[in-house]
């Protein structure tokens, strides 16, 4: 995970599937679905979002601009990150940094699960 402790405020939201005081694996929280990309919000507030995504092989996200600085954590499988016109293969255990407004796309070359920590301004 990108952080070990998060300060909470009344308007913060932690996904109710994640129970305080219990051990869990991020990779197990979001399922694969045939031919689809599955998304689950883990936590968010007005300054950050933590999102999990599971991509079936061959699926992906079209090119778009990052709304803020972001860190991608490859939890399972393999993908290609197209970033500012250059392809970057990524596999489980590796990470990738996106600058705010950078154009990028994601394409799963095998089944692929990722966590994304997005810093909002």
Regions found by a protein language model. Name each.
Residues 1-47, 82:
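A short, N-terminal "cap"/entry segment at the start of jelly-roll beta-barrel domains
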Residues 54-56, 65-81:
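Short, conserved beta-strand element in jelly-roll/cupin
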Residues 100-121:
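Ligand-binding loop in jelly-roll beta-barrel domains
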Residues 35-36, 49-66:
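Conserved short histidine dyad/triad with adjacent acidic residue
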Residues 75-76, 91-92, 110:
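A cytosolic small-molecule/anion-sensing beta-strand core signal
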Residues 46-48, 56-59, 78, 121:
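Short, charged/polar surface micro-motifs in flexible loops or helix N-caps
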Residues 78-80, 87, 103, 113:
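Structural motif
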Residues 85-100:
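Short acidic-glycine-tyrosine-enriched beta hairpin
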